[in-house]
A protein has these predicted regions:
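Amphipathic, interaction-prone secondary-structure segments
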Residues: 45-103
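A short, surface-exposed interaction/processing loop segment used at functional sites
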Residues: 97-132
Length: 141
């Protein structure tokens, strides 16, 4: 049994959190769709009008439910290929010993498979002013 789930099967989060995750997914998928070239041959489309790799990306995007502090977002979760970390979302507020406070919903870039980068949040899913790419949360500027 996989520890990865789709958004609709995610438990332990309220509707506001899940709605914010839905908005985040849409932004990620829009970024991937802009990245993909126009469909003009090659593999046949699974979904009419969609590039097959875009469909595959959407269908294999999932959530790792095993973390205590963070929700890990993964690509390739349900496919036969490699699974990669897209990023992390903070589950509850905490303050690091350095004084940086992280809030519920903060987007965190991956520092590795099990660890988010804790130098600064890249945005918050409850605010509308964050930017993401299909490869992960944006770098700091």
């Amino acid at each position: 049994m996989s520890k990865y789930v789709k958004l609709n099967d995610l438990t332990g989060f309220d509707e506001e959190f899940k709605n914010a995750l839905g908005e985040l997914e849409q932004r990620i998928f829009e970024s991937y769709n802009k990245f993909m070239p126009a469909k003009d041959g090659g593999r046949p489309s699974i979904v009419e009008g969609e590039h097959p790799m875009f469909t595959e990306f959407k269908e294999n995007f999932g959530y790792d439910t095993g973390g205590r502090k963070y929700l890990r977002l993964v690509t390739g979760a349900f496919g036969e290929g490699q699974t990669s970390v897209w990023g992390f979302i903070n589950k509850k507020e905490f303050t690091k010993s350095s004084g940086i406070t992280f809030k519920e919903g903060d987007l965190l870039k991956s520092a590795g498979w099990n660890t988010p980068a804790l130098n600064k949040p890249r945005g918050n899913i409850f605010n509308d002013d964050y930017k993401v790419n299909w490869t992960g949360p944006n770098y700091l500027r």
